[in-house]
Amino acid sequence: MDNKVSASPRGSYRKFLEHLSGAGKAIGVLTSGGDAQGMNAAVRAVVRMGIYVGAKVYFIYEGYQGMVDGGSNIVEANWESVSSILQVGGTIIGSARSKAFRTREGRLKAACNLIHRGITNLCVIGGSGSLTGANIFRMEWSGLLEELAQDGKIDNEAVQKYAYLNVVGMVGSIDNDFCGTDMTIGTDSACHRIIEVIDAIMTTAQSHQRTFVLEVMGRHCGYLALVSALACGADWVFLPESPPEEGWEEQMCVKLSENRAQKKRLNIIIVAEGAIDTLNRPITSEKIKELVVTQLGYDTRVTILGHVQRGGTPSAFDRILASRMGVEAVLALLEATPETPACVVSLSGNHAVRLPLVECVQMTQEVQKAMDERRFKDAVQLRGRSFENNLNTYKRLAIKLPDDKIQKSNCNVAVINVGAPAAGMNAAVRSAVRVGIADGHKMFAVYDGFDGFAKGQIKEIRWGDVGGWTGQGGSILGTKRILPGKYLEEIATQIRTHNINAILIIGGFEAYLGLLELSAAREKHEEFCVPMVMVPATVSNNVPGSDFSIGADTALNTITDTCDRIKQSASGTKRRVFIIETMGGYCGYLANMGGLAAGADAAYIFEEPFDIRDLQSNVEHLTEKMKTTIQRGLVLRNESCSENYTTDFIYQLYSEEGRGVFDCRKNVLGHMQQGGAPSPFDRNFGTKISARAMQWITTKLKESPGKGKRFVSDDSICVLGISKRNVLFQPVAELKNETDFEHRIPKEQWWLKLRPLMKILAKYKTSYDVSDSGQLVPVRHRGGPEEPAAI
């Protein structure tokens, strides 16, 4: 294999995909165990990436059972075999739990079937059981080959030629129960299904003043129950990893009746299917219902969500995750040597990593062992930083301490929304208000952005005022794009009048510019010498200092859903190309990631300049595509990608150049991208990042015991962002150099590295820098104290 590298300007070496060849290799791809949404996206990525590098790729139908049975269950795939499957839930190649593969005879048959097709590279998409099976198969491989040779089923030449089996795993499981991975394929989509059901149930529960007990899947892992409880603001949640303390029955009934007393018309209780008490006895949804009915007399209903959670369309997150994992899996197989251990490709923050399969499985089994031995604190820690943080955040927001038990700080904190509306803003406000109150502050809501601030539209906001805000789209406080520059005097007066000691700004690029203006005004107005922090919230995802913004995931899902419908329309019409315009200002995040999630043929963005030759090349590419069985095209265009190559221009060009081959339609998605109920990701991201911002404010205010302290240092006016896996508070003054103010985007954007991935999956030859790939990372049990906790 010609694995060349080239020297980069920094002196390190860079590795490019075009230097990796799969010629002469055969890859088998199978899905095993329970199905999960997004598996098809992973299969598609493996097949297309495999073909792209010159390897043969085989579908192994019906999981390990198909491998044992052989025959028509192992079929060579081509480019078109995986067309139109991105948006389909489940797995098109079937999945089964195989008893035969658990026996040596079964594995012997499987090895024979693979050898006859020259397959020595396996890509397994499944849970921990499926991946463990693959590793056992790999360990036994040479012994199986020798046995087959002795039985005369293969010759000695084949034993030499196919001496090693390479195995790469991708975790496809809605439970998110695999240690070492931030998110498994299917988890985000399962959260979507749960939240869709909860949102629907809330309307009927409010109408009748009912209590609903919802049972969610996850076997012995409480991840789905926990994140859905956080995303809907459930009254109580039962998890296997963190059982309720003795006397929980009475505590729960008190909590439910308190909420009813505060005019809350419904109660939601979420139960993980593996929920237990501290003595490892099961807690069932029926038992909880009986308790509520007998103790409180509430009209109570049980809803068991069941296999609804496995079904439906994969979310944008799962499609992108699975596509990235599929490509990374093929790279791992190409680079594998006989000494390379079986690995799992996974996501850490927004980075693809490879982890040793055996270590991950052992650690996953340790969680179950800890639960069996009733070491529940250890079980929560072994689940990872993210799980622990989710649990702590849920507890802080769900349970209000009595007023006499909260130590008052005598500080007033203002919360304000700035910029365009973004789904998840309200979840962020709710979280900030409740964490602030729990920390002893008085919380003030500022209505209608800086405009409202100047006019004195400021009101104290209490714990109960923000109940039910998590699932609301848009901005309840109201938000405007107006900057504070021309209202500095008035805003300073309002800060003085209401004695504001700190400000939390939730918004987009305008909020960032506003923060810079307030920072510059500190010299003239001492009122602005208070801690200020901004939480990024914009569909455009263009705020410097953060890889993600609240609202971008919801917008991405809206774009993906719309593209799915449009593709279906184009499939029915045949020979039709759709040009779709997305929002984002000059930032191409939505167009690029939407293109990856929807399976677009091209995506035009400002960050990658294009000319008429590129447009011509795309038209020719689509003309060739129309000669195949896939007679439709999808092209995304960011609204500000080019001053002259407008959506109308591109539409007219495609219409003229494609005359006689395909016809063309255009669709401007517009403000629908800002609306709708927030996705589970945006609800929880908003909740957690806002809680972290309030913790920072509390810490800063504690630095100033006297009333007179003025905050003038740069580190007292920050943007809170996520970079890779870390939560960073970055002074706005430092972020200036990282910002392209003319185009309102950061100078460096992480997602541009994924740009070639979309092109490869759309059958374009391109250069792809894979320098970040290839490191086998050890599985960490816990992050050290110096490592910032994951959001």
Curated annotation (Swiss-Prot):
Its EC number is 2.7.1.11. Its main location: cytoplasm. One of its GO terms (molecular function) is AMP binding. The modification Phosphotyrosine is found at Y651. The keyword Nucleotide-binding applies. Pathway: Carbohydrate degradation; glycolysis; D-glyceraldehyde 3-phosphate and glycerone phosphate from D-glucose: step 3/4. Beta-D-fructose 2,6-bisphosphate binds at residues 481, 538-542, 576, 583-585, 639, 665, 671-674, 744. Residues 412-791 are annotated as: C-terminal regulatory PFK domain 2. The keyword Hydrolase does not apply. The active site is at D175 (proton acceptor). GlcNAcylation decreases enzyme activity. Phosphorylation at Ser-386 promotes interaction with ATG4B. Residues 400-411 are annotated as: Interdomain linker. Homo- and heterotetramers. Phosphofructokinase (PFK) enzyme functions as a tetramer composed of different combinations of 3 types of subunits, called PFKM (M), PFKL (L) and PFKP (P). The composition of the PFK tetramer differs according to the tissue type it is present in. The kinetic and regulatory properties of the tetrameric enzyme are dependent on the subunit composition, hence can vary across tissues. Interacts with ATG4B; promoting phosphorylation of ATG4B. HAMAP family: Phosphofructokinase_I_E (MF_03184). This is ATP-dependent 6-phosphofructokinase, platelet type. It comes from Oryctolagus cuniculus (Rabbit). The gene is PFKP.
